[in-house]
Amino acid sequence: LDWKTSLTVKAHGLGKEEPVYHMEVSGPEYAQIFTARVSLGENGDIIGIGTGSSKRKAQLAAAEAGWKSLDSLKTRTK
């Protein structure tokens, strides 16, 4: 599984909303940097941020950060 799928599975397992990715692009057109922020639900708190040279890389990095955030939350609430 990739990080995006893993995050969706973990969110559903915890009874949370579907992950939503918000994208920003910066830098010149020949060297763009993509930044993804992931939240649970359209208006949820940001649980992960990632950057990359493509939209997919940024989303995967954000999903990994979000997965780790949810995992630490789950561990703290046990």
Q: Which functions belong to the PLM regions below?
A:
Residues 1-78:
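Double-stranded RNA-binding/processing signature
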